[in-house]
Amino acid sequence: MSNRTPLPVPNAKESQLPTLAQYNPKVDLVEVRRDPQKYPRISATPLADAVAQMTPIVYGAALYRGQEMGAAQVRFIANALVSEILADTKFGLRSLSWMEIGMVIRNAVLGGAKEMYGVSVATLYSALVDYAKTEGHDAQTKAYQPK
């Protein structure tokens, strides 16, 4: 048993926090890409709010993975992951919505296409890049094709 304290709840509004259970798998990714007001993008979120919203996603990923993490480690991974995503100019990760980020991380942790050895900045970032190259790219292309 460990003596670690439970993770504190972030200061962001509860309704805005995208948890791993909140995403709707029936929503078409093309619809998500077409409607940035309904599905806000990470690039449109202020840095402090983005870290606060990423924290429960990372914490949920650690719980799903069965990996024990303290609050400081979760905040570190969330902060580093947000910084990496916002600095990305090659793969288009800045245009991902919070719903997509939660979905991708959940699928990666629960046994997606690649083997995931633990929850870290590198593994979560790798899952997001793989998504952006495949499904995300296809959804982006279809979203902006003329009808």
Labelled PLM ranges:
Residues M1-K147:
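Charged interaction scaffolds used for protein-protein
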